[in-house]
Amino acid sequence: MEPIDDILFEVTDAFKTQKEDLLELVTLIDIYGEQVNQEGSYEEKTRFIETLNTLLEDNPSTTGEIGWDLPKGLLKFLSKDNVDVNGRLGTNMIVQGVMKCFYAISIQGEPKKCLITGLELLSSLCSKDFSKSDQQNKEDFVDKKANTLPPEGVIENSSNRKDFPSYGESKSSNEFFLKLKSYILFEFIGASLKRISTLFPSKYLGAAVSTIEKFVYSHADTFEDALFLLRRVYTFCRNYIPPDPPKDIQLNEDFTREMFDKVVEEESELQVRLLRRLCTFGISTPIKTVTTNADVKYYCALNQQKFELSAYYTEYLELFCRYYQMAFSLDVDIEGEFQNVIKECRIIYKSVPQEISAVNDEAKLVLERMVYKLAYTFEVQKAAKEKNVGLDYNGVILFSGIHYLETNQHLVKEMNITDAIYLYLRFTTPSLYSKVYYNVAVESVSRYWLWYAITTEPLEDVKKELKNLSVFVTKTLLHVLLQKNCIQVNQQLRMITFTLLTRLLCLIPEKVAFEFILDVLKTSPLPLAKTSVLCVFKDLSRRRISTKDNDSETDLIVEKLSKLKVNDSNKAQQSNIRHYIQLDSSKMKAVHDCCLQTIQDSFTADAKKSDILLLLTYLNIFIVLKKTWDEDLLKIVCSKIDSNLKSVEPDKLPKYKEIVDKNESLNDYFTGIK
């Protein structure tokens, strides 16, 4: 590399002498910049960036011509060779210098070209651009530390440090540099937009919104947390200022004052619509994997429990509320839009036929699959036909939940169970077909509305609606709730959703509830799902429901069901009671057949631990229900297990002793009643 003094002299001289040949000037800056970045020391790189910044500030006319062509080269200086991801950005003179250069370009450069450059660079950012592993990054950094590390304590960091976690806090250095570069580009794009003088600003804002949406969508799963993207979109929307119309517009008979005023009005409206769109998109997409806790808060309120958020969720809630307030400032009619979502959900599901329309089992299976895919098909078709700038309905749903989190009030006073079910299915089933539609945050708000519907609507109305609802819709709801809950890692959320599922099973017709349980036992690939419905089946078979169906008594039963408690002291004459599931020979035989299949699976060479646990669950249930269960069926189960136990070695079968003990318990019962 040439001496740095010579390089700086050449660049400085070029700004003075080559103003007529700007292409050569840009080429010179690019060549020397590349050379210094690859071969120079930290101090040499710092001097180059500082000199370039000074030249850009002192030569505004030249900056106006070439500024848009420099950002790509400047971003190359933001690399692991120049930036210690463990250090403070405020002490890194290269980072500070690059930011100053971007600022100089944003206020002096040709705004339209700068905007296009910023959007192109933001679109091209990808984590694969920083492909080395974290450990290799750290080792390479240590190797070059003597030449590249900045001197200690230069200036304080003026950036928002929350957006740039240290190496240990970040998922990877890839994420660190992706955040750093995108932060600079977001600011650059916003500053460029403000300076564009045009009668049609929506054209440029629309381009920015489109690029930002693509960037957010592409990286929503890349970042370790969603706070960075939430902040960037929020800051962009908050700081956007609609530019004034150009003052040099010539009004004449071809373009009158009335025409001018109409264009200004339409442009103003379109800009607001674009910001509304970005606001609803920006709140929903970054938090696809973050629950809002609206359902948790409502559940705690129902049970008079204290609702507490961790520091992690508190920070999210603060941003949620900022978005909520911003939506109001943009005149988003949250309640009206939410009602539009409900209407759309009705359109999707209102035509689902009743079970009686299915002539055979094959037709039933087709209809069940159809219900699963209805929302996904609708969403794909809607996206293909979408021509206008509309709100992101995921964001609208989130705002309905944030309204409750923020105000402790419900967005709508009345929500019937049918609409709540349609809403839940509309925003959860598409994710079963494409991860594009996966959104934990929206799902948590949808569950909140299910809770709200079954606890505020009169019980008789809820039961009537569920009875009249298509069985295919009801079963899809139950299956999706169970399936998603089985993969839920948060214990509290899993318990709350299981309680919701239990309550729904208490409210739907007994025939539908048992068919659902049996279907899970026969077909579900998830062992936890089978274990869960068996526990529910046990309690629904033992718990009494008043013949008058008193509200308070039903609530008490459901509460006990949710906790899966057993109380053998509740005895009553069979003629005076009815259970949620009345045991009869056909129901017992159906469950018995499922148990026999589990016995067969548990005593094979490739038996899984989940099969053994499921077998133990069956035995626990038979022990609890032994006095009401068919004795002959129980004896068959005991005999099958006895014969299989004799054919295996104790140390080869997990839980061998537990199986033996529980099976002996049943055998002892038969001995005692002889």
Swiss-Prot record:
GO molecular function: DNA-binding transcription factor binding; protein-disulfide reductase activity
GO biological process: cellular response to oxidative stress; protein-containing complex assembly
One Gene Ontology cellular component: cytoplasm
InterPro entries assigned: YAP-bd/ALF4/Glomulin, YBP1/2
Subcellular localization: Cytoplasm
Effect in UniProt of substituting residue 7 to L: In strain: W303-1a
Superkingdom of source: Eukaryota
Note, other: Present with 3100 molecules/cell in log phase SD medium.
Subunit-structure text: Interacts with YAP1. Forms a peroxide stress induced complex with YAP1 in the cytoplasm. Systematic proteome-wide 2-hybrid interaction studies suggest that YAP1, HYR1/GPX3, and YBP1 all interact with the nuclear pore complex subunit NUP116, which is involved in nucleocytoplasmic transport.
Role summary: Involved in oxidative stress response and redox homeostasis. Required for hydrogen peroxide-induced oxidation and nuclear localization (activation) of YAP1. Functions probably in concert with HYP1/GPX3, the actual YAP1 modifying enzyme. YBP1 is not required for HYP1/GPX3-independent, diamide-induced oxidation of YAP1.
Family: Belongs to the YBP1 family.
Name of this chain's protein: YAP1-binding protein 1
Species per Swiss-Prot/TrEMBL record: Saccharomyces cerevisiae (strain ATCC 204508 / S288c) (Baker's yeast)
Name of the gene this protein is made from: YBP1
